[in-house]
Each structure stands twice: as structure tokens, then as C-alpha cells.
């Protein structure tokens, strides 16, 4: 995602193009009165979403007048995949008037509809003479980097001049092949830091452009958390980049099929061996709103041989998922059903795990409507389920999760727009049907006012059976013993409307936590004193009082965005937490020279708090200048 994708708090004009008119996916675009742009990919089904990390090549101008504002948009046909034999696209338009908390849609304005649903759009007809030219796109780039790292025996400095090449070719207007050589992601955003007091790994979102395109096809059983393919397994190791030697990709549609094929080779880095990654994803459209799909991944590590007397072998993962949906249930209601099954081979030849140990399966029935909504899901993960190119923070469980929600609107009120009440239940067992986790969470109220302000309050009862000792700070200072823990918590949140020049949010959660109590509060502010300037400080503090010991955590984040023009942006990101004692800053200047051709200036600096001398000392710093040029034939 680039800085231009941050206009959600502004008045804006929004539209989508469903270029295959299949009512399953679409290109999402919007522009505000300052000609700042947002674009992304809409994916329907359970867990439907708008992925704003996709960046297309297009341009927009805007002008504010005495009677309002107007915009002019230029979008090359080459930016889209489409069917040249069809003269009809799906389309919808929306205007967001923030000062009135008002949203106006061209069509799809009923309560169970919206701009994020291509099946609720209208039709754009009479499209003729559309062409992608030769369909060849060449994107060379050059990069100058420099870095400095402070070591115990001195400083290690490095500098380099390098380059790479991306080639895209449209085999058909709806099917595109891509090659990338010596790929670099210096301009990618840094991950948002969190303080993780849970037992499980956190799934950070993908930020790299090459892996973002086609993400709507790669999605597998969304909302079920199965993740047989997770692109951050490729070219990253614990957040640190591993060089990508080359990659090849095929994306698009052919008839009723959606295809996504990927192969990437990563290079050697320290003790990390070169690897080859392959991914294949195929989905077939069924009827007007349903799909069935398969996924396959392979991970092959070169020269690994034996690992602690075990023989590492190529790791293969296979999966299938089914999505059934209708928007005409009982006349005008939405109803969705999802099912999936995934399995993989053993990591080592000597493994004694069986097929069911290395598999996951589940289903989900969803009734996402307004004012009544409900869902129930069930899933099982084997005790050795861990796909090599996927993400599985937890295995060896059976989980049942139902929820019920009632969200009435109040059209006759001048104060309240909507109130939401929700009941969620989680019942998680081990594979022997012994209870591990049980949570009942009740939203007593979640009120959206006509002003756009929101206030909510939840209560929850939780049961946890800890099977193994838990090092909660990950430094061996506080170890939670094997036991059963029962707690109650309460949480509340207040958030003001984002269209204001000063908007803010505050939240607090307090109650039982393992063997003691926890109180967490957070506060964030969004300041927009001038057009094109946005400042976002955020602070989260957590007090933990346990029978085994006490501690507190502090997390500070600050982001500043400056839009000099609709083609020149600067962002700075500062983060600190007192568990790692790391202070880091990421600074990026992006100049869109012409749509598709960019100049990036990037500077990163990380400090470690030295408690002995009560100061921060530099751990490392780095800078990069990267320029890319897109030429279309």
C-alpha cells in the first residue's frame, strides 16, 4: 500500500469496475478533492474485503470550486484484466460526504448491500475497441543502498549499487505472465509493531507488491484461518529479507477458471540455504456466486541434507475449498457456506505422523445480513499440521464458534444511527475432546451516532487450560505453570468521527488475566490541521499483576503523512516498546514521476535503549534510493 491509499477520513468519490462481470471480484478506486487516490481489489465471499495493497497505473485531477468539487480520471485499459469479447462490465459509484456522515450509492444501497459487493452493482455497456496494445510491460529499476551496523567489535558498513527487472506480458487480456529478476522491496512499508502477550505467533500482512497482485485469487477459505499459502514465507525470515534471485507468475482468468501460478527462487543468506517455492491456485466459478478451488504448494531447500539426524525432504501441501453463496435467500437475504480440507507431507523422512495428523478441515455457515446476522463454524487442525509455505500459529485442536448479531438502524432519530448487540462463543478442545479454551463475549452495546462517533462496551468470560509452562515475557522472568485459569474481563471504546480535523479514540480493558489481573488502555489521535498533512500518535499501556510476578508494557507508535501533491508523498513511522527496548524509525519519500514510474528515498534507523547508561544507542541504520520506470508496448 502506498501513501495515496489513506483517504478514508476524507470526502471522496468511489467506484468499482467488475471487468469480467462475474460478480465475484472487482477493481476498487476512489479519489478525494485533493486528487489523492486509493485503489485495491475487491474479493467477495465469506470474509469479503477490499485489499488496498494493490497499486494500479492510473491518474486523477481534481478541482474545488464555489459550488463543490470535480474530478477527472484517466485509466489505461492496460491497468485491468478483462474479457475483450464482452462489451459489458459491472460498475457502481459511491460518494462519501464525511461532514454529514452520509454515503450515497448509485445502486446497491439496501441494508444488505454496499460498494464492496460487485453482485450489487449495475452495468456499464457499449464498451468497444478496448485494447491492451502488445500487452508487454517492462519495468527496470536501479537501487543505491548503504547501511551501518554497530557490533561488539566495531562498526560494519556496506554500500551497493544494484538493479533488477520486472517483465509483464498479457498472454490474453485476462491472463498475464510476469517475470522478476533480482527483486528488491526497499520501498515496502515496515510492519506495525505490537506487544504479543499470547502464546501464538502473529500474522503480519504482506507489504511487497510482487506478492500482492493476485491476492484475491490466492485467498483460501477466507475467515477460517487455515492459510495453506502465506506469501511472507517466501523471501523473509523472522521479518528480515532474504534475496530473491528470480520469480515467475501467471495470473488471471480463462473461461470460468481463475488461475494463480507462482515460482520463486531465493538465494543464500548466512546459514540459510537457497530455496525454491512453487504455488498453484485454481478456482472455478459455479453459478452466479459460488466457487470451488484447489491449492498446491511446494518448498524445496537445497543442500540441507540432514538436520539434527533427520533428513529434510521437499514439502508439499494440497488443499481444496468450496464457497457456496446466494444473495436471494428468502428473497433478498445473503447466505453463505464454506468448507475446506488441507493436508501436507511430513517435513522429515523419518516422521511417524500420519495423514490426519498433518491435515486440517472445517466448515462455516454464514448469514451476514442487516439487522440480523449469525454464523457458525467448526474446524479441526491435526497435531502436526504446519504447511511449509503457510501459516498455522496453533494446531492440535477442534474449535466450534457460533455468533449472533442484531444491528437495528434508527432512521427517525437525529442522534443515533445504529446500535449493535452481539454474542460470540468459542469452544476449543484438544483432539481428545478435552476442553482447552472457552470464551463467551457479549457486546452490551456498540452505538454509532449520526455524528459518526462510536461508543461500545463488551464483557467476556474466559476459560484456559494451559498444557505447557508459558514464558509470557519470553525472557524466562515470569513462567506461568500448567493449570486451569478462569477469568472475567470488561472492555470499552470511544471513537470520534474521522472527518474532523482532530479525531481520537480511547479504549480500556480490565479484568482477570491468567493467575492475576490485567488492565490495558490505549489512546490514539489523528490530527489533520492542513490539507495533505496528517499526524497519528498512538500509545498503549498494559499493567499485568500475576501470582508469578508483575510487569507493565508500553507501546508507542507515531506516523506522519505529508502529501505535497497528488504525486509526491512523505511518510515517517516511529515505534517503540519497552519489552524489546527498540526504538525504530522508517522514513519514505515517494515521487510518482509518471504513473508507473517512481522514485523512492528510504531511511531506516534503529536504536536500543541502554538502561545501564540511560540512553539510546544505534543498532543499525540504512538508506536506499530506488528508481523504477515502466514502459508499455
Model-found features: residue ranges?
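Low-complexity/repetitive intrinsically disordered segments
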Residues: 1-3, 601
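Structural preference for beta-rich elements and adjacent junctions enriched in aromatics
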Residues: 4-285, 289-294
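Residue-level recognition of well-ordered beta-strand positions that form the cores
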Residues: 16, 74-76, 92, 141, ...
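A short, flexible beta-alpha/helix-coil linker loop
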Residues: 36, 145-147, 267-268, 299-301, ...
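Outer-membrane beta-barrel transmembrane domain signature of Gram-negative proteins
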Residues: 111-131, 267-331, 367, 454-509, ...
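Catalytic-domain carbohydrate-binding cleft regions of carbohydrate-active enzymes
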Residues: 156-157, 166, 176, 185-192, ...
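Exposed, low-structure sequence patches enriched in small/polar residues
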Residues: 243, 328-633
Amino acid at each position: 500500500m502506498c501513501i495515496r491509499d489513506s483517504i478514508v477520513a476524507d470526502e471522496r468519490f468511489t467506484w468499482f469496475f467488475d471487468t469480467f462481470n462475474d460478480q465475484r471480484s472487482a477493481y476498487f478506486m476512489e479519489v478525494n478533492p485533493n486528487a489523492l487516490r486509493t485503489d485495491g481489489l475487491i474479493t467477495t465471499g465469506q470474509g469479503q474485503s477490499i485489499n488496498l495493497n494493490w497499486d494500479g497505473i492510473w491518474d486523477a485531477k481534481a478541482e474545488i470550486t464555489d459550488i463543490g468539487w470535480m474530478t477527472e480520471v484517466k485509466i489505461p485499459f492496460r491497468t485491468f484484466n478483462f474479457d475483450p469479447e464482452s462489451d459489458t462490465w459491472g460498475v457502481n459509484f459511491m460518494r462519501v460526504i464525511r461532514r454529514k456522515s452520509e454515503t450515497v450509492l448509485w445502486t446497491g444501497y439496501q441494508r444488505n448491500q454496499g460498494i464492496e459487493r460487485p453482485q450489487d452493482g449495475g452495468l456499464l455497456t457499449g464498451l468497444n475497441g478496448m485494447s491492451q496494445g502488445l500487452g508487454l510491460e517492462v519495468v527496470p529499476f536501479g537501487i543505491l543502498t548503504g547501511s551501518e551496523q554497530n557490533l561488539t567489535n566495531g562498526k560494519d558498513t556496506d554500500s551497493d549499487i544494484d538493479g533488477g527487472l520486472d517483465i509483464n506480458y498479457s498472454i490474453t487480456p485476462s491472463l498475464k505472465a510476469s517475470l522478476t529478476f533480482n527483486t528488491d522491496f526497499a520501498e515496502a512499508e515496515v510492519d506495525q509493531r505490537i506487544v504479543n502477550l499470547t502464546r501464538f505467533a502473529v500474522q503480519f500482512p504482506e507489504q511487497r507488491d510482487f506478492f500482492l497482485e493476485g491476492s484475491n485469487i490466492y485467498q483460501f477459505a477466507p475467515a477460517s484461518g487455515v492459510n495453506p499459502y502465506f506469501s511472507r514465507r517466501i523471501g523473509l525470515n523472522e521479518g528480515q529479507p532474504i534475496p530473491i534471485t528470480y520469480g515467475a507468475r501467471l495470473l488471471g482468468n480463462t473461461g470460468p477458471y481463475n488461475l494463480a501460478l507462482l515460482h520463486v527462487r531465493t538465494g543464500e543468506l548466512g546459514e540459510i540455504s537457497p530455496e525454491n517455492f512453487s504455488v498453484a491456485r485454481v478456482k472455478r466459478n459455479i453459478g452466479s456466486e459460488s466457487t470451488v478451488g484447489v491449492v498446491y504448494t511446494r518448498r524445496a531447500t537445497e543442500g540441507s541434507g540432514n538436520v539434527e539426524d533427520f533428513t529434510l525432504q521437499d514439502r508439499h501441501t494440497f488443499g481444496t475449498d468450496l464457497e457456496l453463496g446466494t444473495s436471494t435467500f428468502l428473497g433478498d437475504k445473503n447466505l453463505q457456506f464454506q468448507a475446506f480440507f488441507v493436508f501436507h507431507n511430513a517435513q522429515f523422512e523419518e516422521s511417524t505422523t500420519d495423514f490426519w495428523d498433518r491435515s486440517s478441515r472445517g466448515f462455516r455457515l454464514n448469514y451476514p445480513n442487516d439487522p440480523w446476522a449469525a454464523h457458525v463454524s467448526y474446524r479441526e487442525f491435526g497435531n502436526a499440521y504446519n504447511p511449509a509455505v503457510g501459516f498455522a500459529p496453533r494446531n492440535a485442536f477442534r474449535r466450534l464458534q457460533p455468533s449472533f448479531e442484531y444491528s437495528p438502524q434508527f432512521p427517525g432519530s437525529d442522534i443515533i444511527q445504529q446500535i449493535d448487540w452481539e454474542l460470540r462463543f468459542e469452544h476449543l478442545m484438544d483432539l481428545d475432546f478435552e476442553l482447552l479454551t472457552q470464551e463467551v463475549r457479549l457486546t452490551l452495546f456498540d452505538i454509532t451516532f449520526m455524528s459518526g462517533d462510536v461508543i461500545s462496551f463488551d464483557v467476556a468470560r474466559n476459560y484456559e487450560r494451559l498444557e505447557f509452562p508459558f514464558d509470557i515475557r519470553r525472557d524466562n522472568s515470569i513462567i506461568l505453570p500448567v493449570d486451569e485459569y478462569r477469568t472475567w474481563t470488561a472492555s470499552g471504546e470511544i471513537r470520534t468521527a474521522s472527518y474532523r480535523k482532530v479525531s481520537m479514540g480511547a479504549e480500556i480493558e480490565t479484568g482477570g488475566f491468567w493467575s492475576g489481573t490485567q488492565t490495558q488502555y490505549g489512546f490514539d489521535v489523528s490530527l489533520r490541521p492542513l490539507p495533505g498533512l496528517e499526524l497519528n500518535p498512538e500509545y498503549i499501556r498494559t499493567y499485568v499483576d500475576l501470582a508469578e510476578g508483575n510487569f507493565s508494557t508500553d507501546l508507542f507508535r507515531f506516523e506522519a503523512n505529508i502529501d505535497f501533491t497528488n504525486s509526491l508523498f512523505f511518510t515517517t513511522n516511529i515505534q517503540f516498546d519497552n519489552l524489546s527496548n527498540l526504538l525504530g524509525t522508517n522514513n519514505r519519500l515517494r515521487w510518482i514521476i509518471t504513473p508507473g514510474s517512481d522514485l523512492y528515498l528510504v531511511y531506516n534507523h534503529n536504536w536500543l535503549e541502554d538502561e545501564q547508561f540511560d540512553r539510546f544507542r544505534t543498532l543499525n541504520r540504512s538508506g536506499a534510493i530506488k528508481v523504477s520506470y515502466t514502459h508499455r508496448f
